[in-house]
Amino acid sequence: QIGRIVGYLNKADRVLVCGCGSSGLSAKEMEIRFMRIGIDVDSMTDSDMIKMASVFQNRRSLIFGFSISGEREEVTYLLREAYNKGAKTVLFTTNNGKKFSEYYSEVVALSSLRHLNYGNVISPQFPILIILDIIYAYYVEQNKYIREGMHDSTLCALEE
């Protein structure tokens, strides 16, 4: 599954990552990390912006949606509409029900504790960030010198 997702990243012209609440923080983290290695990526956390973004997706788009419960309406709406327009869509959720398979290219099952979405014991972002680290490492490894060069260039830009 990770290999397929990295393949989607390699082929996408544009990547959009969305999530609300603590999942939105993970979306922003993905944007920052993957931008630094050359991916044209944006993150969205505003409910209205997420819904409106569905209009602009096409077969060259890749959409990542983060929803611990898998039921955040804005996130599922964007993924469903983008999928119907030919985009690749990936839902990250702890809820791996059958209902997801018809609208998403991939459903990444996250490990979970009971009531993880409440965030009162372990950060709800934690399982998302772990899987993002795995995807990041796999993606960088496929073309290490170019990706590391891009990362170094972003460091230089920050020092200017």
Model-derived features: where do they sit?
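A short, well-structured juxtamembrane/interface segment
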Residues: Q1-K11
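Glycine-rich phosphate-binding loops that contact phosphosugars or nucleotide phosphates
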Residues: N10-I130, I134-N143
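A short, charged, Gly/Pro-tolerant segment at domain boundaries
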Residues: Y145-E160
